[in-house]
Amino acid sequence: MNIARVEYYFAEMLSILEMPRQEEWKVDIVTAVWDNDPCLIEGGTVQISNNIWFVGTINNDDSTFAVADKVYDRAIPIDLDSRADAFECEDTPPVYISTDHLNALFEQAKQDYPISQEMLDKLDEVNAYVIKAFRLAFGNRIMKQIRDYVPCFIACGGTEIQAVDFIVAKKVLRKFESLSLGFMKDELTKFENYLDRTFGKNTMVICKQYIEQLKKNN
């Protein structure tokens, strides 16, 4: 998916994957139905199974269009900002995990490490600040993802504040790219100070690094 305007050609799939019932995860492939259609195409549609994850790359630079907010709303971006050195590794046997088992691990993490009410209250405050200062908002979709993501991050050995730092930087602050940031450097500095007051001075590292990058590039 190394192409610009990912929200155009992947929009239908994104909408389908957000439907609550898996039996609704059907993608229209063809309008005409033939007797010799492939066996997995029924009535011109293909059923998407629950063991499929979509991973792809999109260009986001001066030569392409800006990535739409709804892409960041639905996906978790992983930035490739540095070049890794080549390395050799030993062959290791594969580990097979069923989708049911993986989903059970996710559910167990939510029971064992739920996001704290204190953190939810802080996120509500940040949301109100961002709405007032930048006319942007988290939205219910992102808040649901935070509730799902934070427990799994903690179960993997991280902390609550690290998980919130990552998800806010990747999903909320990315929306700032659509603003006229050249005229908002003072507001960005004030927001940095606000994060220090709300979460602590030595926390929210990814968010503050990204804000500094925005100020530098605009």
Where in this protein do the model-derived segments appear?
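C-terminal regulatory/interaction module of P-loop NTP-utilizing enzymes
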Residues: 1-218
